[in-house]
Design a protein with these regions (language model features):
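Mid-to-C-terminal alpha-helical segments outside catalytic/metal-binding sites
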Residues: 159-195
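Charged helix-capping and loop-helix junction motifs
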Residues: 23-27, 123-130, 159-164
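A structural motif corresponding to the C-terminal end of an alpha-helix
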Residues: 28-39, 134-141, 171-174
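Divalent metal-binding pocket/active-site signature
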Residues: 1-79
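Hydrophobic faces of well-ordered beta-strands that scaffold small-molecule active sites
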Residues: 41-43, 66-69, 91-93, 143-147
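Short acidic/histidine-rich active-site segments
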Residues: 94, 138-157
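Active-site gating loops and adjacent loop-to-helix segments of metal-dependent hydrolytic enzymes
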Residues: 1-25, 88, 95, 102-118, ...
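Catalytic core of soluble alpha/beta enzymes
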Residues: 51-53, 67, 72-104
Length: 195
């Protein structure tokens, strides 16, 4: 998605093997998270098979707080999402997964040479209705909602959250369910008392 970044930086990235032994660097990261139970592990923007391996490794390292980034975008099946929820992991519900311009853009890096080309990649696009049905099927009690807005090419995070909450209400999520996903679950994830 970032051709120039990939050429310059990818060789330094910590790899997540989908099977077999892991690198010392990955083991060190997982152990650091395990040693600090107040910290949660975010799977990051990786593939579906890599997500499933991270979850397996999190259990192996006894990491109890994990947030699966963009499960809809990672093309995790609904069964994989439900399995992750049953295992006690949170799933991220993010507005950009269904409402965002997918044209090339600069946001993480201001230099044009680092332009995000992810909009050019073929991928399954989920509609708002599909996304809402997935949240309903897995269960709001397992989701942490956000927008990923606020970057240069998107509206503000506040505008995004307003859109997200309005859409949830339109799809008949209750105020209590919305509060669970926007306040209660995030508080649990970072170790605060439920709000």
């Amino acid at each position: 998605a970032y051709p120039e970044f990939a050429r310059e930086e990818l060789s330094r990235a910590v790899r997540i093997p989908t099977e077999g032994p892991i690198s010392d660097e990955l083991a060190e990261i997982l152990q650091m998270v395990a040693d600090h139970p107040d910290v949660y592990l975010n799977t990051g923007h990786v593939s579906g098979p890599e997500v499933m391996r991270i979850l397996e490794l999190a259990e192996e390292f006894k990491i109890h707080k994990v947030l699966i980034a963009h499960p809809a975008r990672q093309q995790l099946s609904i069964e994989q999402q439900k399995d992750a929820a049953r295992r006690g992991f949170f799933l991220e519900g993010c507005l950009v997964d269904w409402l965002y311009p997918h044209a090339p853009r600069t946001h993480y890096y201001v230099e044009k040479k680092y332009m995000d080309r992810s909009g050019d990649l073929p991928r399954m696009r989920r509609s708002a209705a599909q996304w809402m049905a997935d949240i309903r099927e897995v269960g709001p009690e397992y989701f942490v909602l956000g927008t990923d807005y606020g970057i240069r090419a998107a509206p503000s995070a506040v505008q995004g959250m307003r859109t997200l909450i309005t859409t949830l209400l339109d799809y008949e999520f209750t105020p209590d369910e919305i509060r669970t996903m926007t306040a209660h679950n995030p508080a649990r994830l970072i170790g605060l008392d439920p709000l």
